[in-house]
Amino acid sequence: MLTYQTWEAEEKPSFPHDNETKGALDVLTWAFRQYKDDIVYACSFGVEGIVLIDLISQVKPDAEIVFLDTGLHFRETYKTIEKVKEKYPSLRIVMKKPSLSLEEQAQQLGDELWKHNPNKCCELRKVIPLREALTGITAWISGLRREQSPTRSHVEYINKDDKFKSIKICPLIHWTWKDVWNYVYKRRLPYNVLHDRGYPSIGCEPCTSPALDPNDLRSGRWVGHGKTECGLHIS
C-alpha cells in the first residue's frame, strides 16, 4: 500500500484525464479501494467540495467527511452543510473543533487574533485540528485545483504530504472553474449561496471578502495580510 513511509519505494498509479470527470472518479475509486476506511475527506463545503462529495458518494456512500469547524464560519456555510446532510444521509460528517474555544483563544492571545496574527489563528483553528483528525489515518482527500492559484499549480492526483506525514489525494486537479459549475448545475447540487454574491472562495467570515480580482478566485481571502493560504497546503 502506498503510504507516506513507502512513498519512495512504491510505484504511483497514473490516471487518464480525458474522460467526463477528468480522472476524478478513477482517482477516488482507486483511493477507496487502496485505503478503505483509512482515508478521510477534509472539506470546506465550498463549491469544489460539493462536487467532490457528490463524486465520493458514488464510490463510497458512507465515507468520512471532516469539516474544520473554527467557530468563525459564515451562517450560510453551516446551512450548506445541513443541505448536504439531507442529500447524502449515509456520509459521516465530522465537525472537528479546535481545542481552544474562541473565548479561551482571546484570553490567551488577545481579541480577534485573526486581525493581528492570522497565521497563528489558522494554525490553532485549522492546521492543528486537521493534524488531530488525520492521526492514525494514511491518506486524505482535498479539493485543490491547479487553476486556483500559483501555489496550487503543480499539485498532482497523488501527493506526498510532508505537512501531515500523509498521502494527499487531489482528484480535481484538471477541473476548471467552469467545469465545477457545469457539474453542479447538471447534477442540481446544493451549494453555498455566497458563491452567488461574489465569493468564489469561502473560508472564515472575518477573513473572507468578495473577490477583489475576478481573475483571481482567492483574492478575497485575508485581504491586506499578503496571505492566500491557511497553511493546510503549505509544507
UniProtKB/Swiss-Prot annotation:
The organism's place on the tree of life at top rank: Bacteria
Keyword Iron recorded: yes
Pathway: Sulfur metabolism; hydrogen sulfide biosynthesis; sulfite from sulfate
Phylogenetic lineage: Bacteria, Bacillati, Bacillota, Bacilli, Bacillales
Primary location group: cytoplasm
GO MF term list: 4 iron, 4 sulfur cluster binding; adenylyl-sulfate reductase (thioredoxin) activity; metal ion binding; phosphoadenylyl-sulfate reductase (thioredoxin) activity
Catalytic activity: [thioredoxin]-disulfide + sulfite + AMP + 2 H(+) = adenosine 5'-phosphosulfate + [thioredoxin]-dithiol
Location in or out of the cell: Cytoplasm
Pfam family of the protein (one): PAPS_reduct
Family, per entry: Belongs to the PAPS reductase family. CysH subfamily.
Keywords attached to this entry: Cytoplasm, Iron, Iron-sulfur, Metal-binding, Oxidoreductase
Record protein name field: Adenosine 5'-phosphosulfate reductase
PANTHER family the record matches: PHOSPHOADENOSINE PHOSPHOSULFATE REDUCTASE
UniProt EC number: 1.8.4.10
